[in-house]
Amino acid sequence: MPQLVPFFFVNQVVFAFIVLTVLIYAFSKYILPRLLRTYISRIYINKL
């Protein structure tokens, strides 16, 4: 199994760390603010 070979394991850990970092950055910078803005505007419209 290539997952248990140390070189591949280190490669997978590094790649997973990079992917998670990019995903967290993208969500916090672009995706979540849009969803939050939409959510807040819907709440505001419903309370009118």
Curated annotation (Swiss-Prot):
GO terms for molecular function: proton transmembrane transporter activity. It is found in: Mitochondrion membrane. One of its GO terms (cellular component) is mitochondrion. It comes from the Eukaryota. GO terms for biological process: proton motive force-driven ATP synthesis. The chain crosses the membrane at residues 4-24. It is a single-pass membrane protein. It holds the Pfam family Fun_ATP-synt_8. InterPro entries: ATP_synth_su8_fun. Its main location: mitochondrion. Keywords: ATP synthesis, CF(0), Hydrogen ion transport, Ion transport, Membrane, Mitochondrion, Transmembrane, Transmembrane helix, Transport. F-type ATPases have 2 components, CF(1) - the catalytic core - and CF(0) - the membrane proton channel. Mitochondrial membrane ATP synthase (F(1)F(0) ATP synthase or Complex V) produces ATP from ADP in the presence of a proton gradient across the membrane which is generated by electron transport complexes of the respiratory chain. F-type ATPases consist of two structural domains, F(1) - containing the extramembraneous catalytic core and F(0) - containing the membrane proton channel, linked together by a central stalk and a peripheral stalk. During catalysis, ATP synthesis in the catalytic domain of F(1) is coupled via a rotary mechanism of the central stalk subunits to proton translocation. Belongs to the ATPase protein 8 family. This is ATP synthase protein 8. The lineage of its organism: Eukaryota, Fungi, Dikarya, Ascomycota, Pezizomycotina.
